């Protein structure tokens, strides 16, 4: 199999693009680096396509390794035919290779191997030939051998049937067809272990659906219900169809003496050996596909969350609400530095509202706070009421926003938070994190395990695959935005292309010991950061007030000479870059192709350089919807059907989206209520962070459920 050709066909791109990308990957280049700085080589493949390419490359290389291992094993046994070799080499999945290898795989002792040890294989072969002139039981008398523990003809015949059953089970073609029949016509059944038990899985207490129609979120929910011992789950296969298929394939002479015995053997093969294995395989396959779908949705949600626009230039009050232990506050300046922390007790059981308001007024006046970032956890509703009352009593124009607390408690108790804020307690760290999440969501959220951020579905049921996928999303976001080399934390730096955790820490140590970086080239003095790591990371690092103004842009150092030549050609200097006097540079470029040849760089690289010079270090997050800032409060009891509101999409799942309309309980817009056309997935219409207009369909105050529609 030519791996590059296959990947090109699957992804709908040219083989040359795949070959170039594979070569760069094998040379140790990262996906963000290839996507951004090697566009000529790959034909400008996006980071998303490159990720898919990489995943398929790993899978297909592992598949090729497996094929070679299997071929070597069969050849060692002296059983490798040219036909079998061709079948194995042509196999496109690991399951197909497993099916072909099954008859030759070293087996533990089975009923069939025991029967073979007793000398019953010739009898099994005779039955399979279907040319007996006497009944199989009569023929079996010839195989009675007390020394080999075959005491009766019945025992001999049963042993032969065991051999036949295993042979049928090991047939790769049979397994493939049975798997397809089961997927096409089979049903997944789930039932309650205790029908009276209350749980979130009640809709699956008596559930069945065709395997080919099962939605991913249902599979994940059913699996979790089974794991938590609320459900029993099984696959109901089209057994009659399958047995008829095996009958047609195996019994060539229905009138032969051997037909009933063969039918018993194939029934046993299916019920005892094939069906349980196929059920396991199908359930694993369904889970894997559901998992992949959930990971894609989670990744998209996480990307939108990380790419939320920063709220710059404001002094923010972070508010971590609580009852008994009090509300923790942290005042954070526009650079993220914590100016002050305190605790107030406006909520039950203390209810010291006036005292709390006095503290808040003093903080707002002293630090010129313009924005309050309130966590959405316990006591959030009560805290919001106090904030709204306060805003009506003060002259300063202060607004507030409710932020998702997910992951804040994990972060505030982590070793990283302890190192960052050694003098603060867990609550104060959490309050500081609330404020910083608004000021720079990306820089703050990278400190938290992505699985704890709260924008997925069933993420805690998933494995290493999810962790890797989410790390890739974070990596792509961080490199798309770029990082300030002189202020970025180690948590942020470790996601930069080519930078490991150890190198990230070394960058921070170097900065602490030597002061600010004056140029990108200084990175080469950082311990463990060699030329390859420098090549991969330099373009994504920004120095805003360094010696070279190009260090503040996304232009890679390898293109500095060409960039200086470009500026000279068009009548500019590096000082013009510093003074932002190159805004109209693109209008001066008449012929990109010719100019690129003159500069000895690629045309795509030239276009990127011109774009960077026109808008140096432009933040792509500026294009994202801005968060809704509030100054008044709404409660769920205030909602009535037909009310139209603006809200923020907080989470997207397979069957809809949850929208924050400012009432502490997110409302659900079902997929059917998103638009008038048919859509396969909500992500076709909305993303996390989107500002949407919704209409209230129904409100259940008791169950705290709000149904919304976007069809207004």
Describe the predicted segments one by one:
Residues 240, 269-279, 399-484, 489, ...:
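OB-fold/S1-family RNA-binding modules
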Residues 49-52, 63-318, 322-424, 431:
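Duplex nucleic acid-engaging cores and interfaces of nucleic-acid transaction enzymes
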Residues 1-19, 26:
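Generic start-of-chain signal for non-secretory N-termini
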Residues 30-31, 46-147, 151, 480-623, ...:
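Accessory alpha-helical DNA-binding modules that contact the DNA backbone or grooves
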Residues 37-39, 128, 238, 321, ...:
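Short, ordered loop/turn segments at secondary-structure junctions
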Residues 7, 20, 29-44, 355:
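Feature marking long nucleic-acid-engaging regions of large polymerase/nuclease enzymes
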Residues 313-318, 328, 384-387, 519-522, ...:
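Short beta-alpha junctions and helix-cap segments that line functional grooves
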Residues 98-102, 111-112, 126-128, 134, ...:
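S1/OB-fold single-stranded RNA-binding interface
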């Amino acid at each position: 199999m030519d791996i590059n050709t296959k990947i090109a066909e699957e992804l709908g791109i040219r083989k040359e693009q795949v070959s170039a990308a594979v070569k760069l990957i094998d040379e140790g280049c990262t996906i963000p680096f290839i996507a951004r700085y090697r566009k000529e080589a790959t034909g400008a493949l996006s980071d998303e396509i490159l990720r898919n390419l990489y995943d398929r490359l790993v899978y297909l290389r592992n598949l090729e390794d497996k094929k070679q291992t299997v071929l070597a094993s069969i050849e060692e046994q002296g059983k490798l035919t040219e036909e079998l070799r061709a079948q194995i080499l042509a196999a496109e999945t690991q399951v197909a290779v497993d099916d072909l290898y099954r008859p030759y795989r070293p087996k533990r002792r089975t009923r069939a191997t025991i029967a073979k040890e007793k000398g019953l294989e010739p009898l099994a072969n005779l039955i399979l030939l279907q040319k007996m002139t006497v009944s199989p039981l009569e023929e079996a008398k010839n195989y009675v051998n007390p020394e080999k523990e075959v005491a009766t003809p019945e025992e001999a015949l049963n042993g032969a049937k065991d051999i036949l059953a295993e042979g049928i089970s090991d047939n790769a073609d049979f397994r493939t067809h049975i798997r397809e029949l089961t997927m096409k016509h089979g049903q997944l059944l789930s039932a309650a272990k205790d029908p009276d038990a209350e749980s979130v899985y009640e809709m699956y207490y008596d559930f069945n659906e065709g395997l080919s129609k099962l939605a991913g979120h249902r599979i994940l929910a059913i699996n979790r219900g089974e794991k938590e011992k609320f459900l029993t789950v099984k696959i109901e296969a089209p057994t009659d169809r399958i047995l008829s298929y095996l009958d047609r394939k195996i019994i060539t002479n229905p009138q032969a003496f051997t037909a009933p015995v063969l039918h018993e053997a194939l029934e046993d093969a299916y019920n005892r050996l094939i069906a349980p294995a196929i059920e396991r395989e199908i359930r694993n396959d369904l889970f894997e596909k559901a998992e992949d779908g959930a990971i894609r949705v989670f990744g998209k949600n996480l990307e939108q969350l990380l790419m939320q626009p920063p709220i710059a230039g404001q002094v923010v009050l972070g508010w971590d609400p609580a009852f008994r232990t009090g509300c923790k506050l942290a005042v954070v300046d526009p650079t993220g530095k914590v100016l002050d922390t305190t605790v107030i007790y406006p909520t039950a059981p203390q209810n010291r509202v006036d005292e709390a308001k006095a503290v808040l007024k003093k903080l707002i006046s002293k630090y010129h706070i313009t924005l309050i970032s309130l966590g959405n956890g316990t006591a959030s509703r009560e805290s919001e009421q106090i904030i709204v009352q306060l805003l009506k009593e003060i002259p300063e124009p202060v607004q507030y926003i409710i932020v998702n607390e997910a992951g804040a408690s994990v972060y505030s108790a982590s070793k990283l938070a302890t190192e960052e804020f050694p003098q603060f307690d867990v609550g104060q760290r959490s309050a500081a994190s609330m404020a910083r999440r608004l000021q720079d969501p990306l820089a703050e959220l990278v400190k938290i395990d992505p699985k704890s951020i709260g924008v997925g579905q069933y993420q805690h049921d998933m494995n290493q695959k999810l962790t890797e996928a989410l790390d890739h999303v974070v990596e792509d976001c961080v490199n798309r935005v770029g990082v300030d080399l002189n202020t970025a934390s180690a948590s942020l730096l470790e996601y930069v292309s080519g930078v490991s955790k150890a190198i990230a820490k070394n960058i921070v140590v170097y900065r602490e010991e030597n002061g600010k970086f004056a140029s990108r080239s200084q990175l080469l003095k950082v311990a463990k950061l060699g030329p390859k790591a420098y090549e991969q990371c330099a373009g994504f690092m920004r120095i805003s007030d360094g010696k070279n103004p190009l260090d503040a842009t996304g232009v890679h150092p390898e293109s500095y000479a060409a960039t200086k030549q470009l500026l000279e050609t068009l009548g500019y200097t590096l000082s013009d870059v510093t003074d932002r006097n190159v805004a109209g540079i693109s209008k001066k470029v008449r012929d990109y192709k010719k100019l690129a040849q003159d500069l000895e760089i690629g045309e795509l690289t030239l276009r990127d350089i011109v774009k960077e010079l026109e808008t140096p270090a432009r933040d792509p997050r500026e294009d994202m919807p801005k968060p809704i800032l509030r100054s008044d409060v709404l409660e769920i009891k205030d909602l009535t059907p037909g009310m139209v509101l603006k809200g923020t999409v907080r989470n997207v799942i397979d069957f809809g989206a949850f929208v924050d309309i400012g009432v502490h309980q997110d409302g659900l817009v079902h997929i059917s209520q998103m638009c008038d056309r048919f859509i396969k997935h909500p992500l076709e219409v909305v993303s996390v962070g989107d500002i949407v207009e919704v209409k209230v369909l129904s409100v259940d105050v008791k169950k705290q459920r709000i149904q919304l529609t976007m069809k207004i």
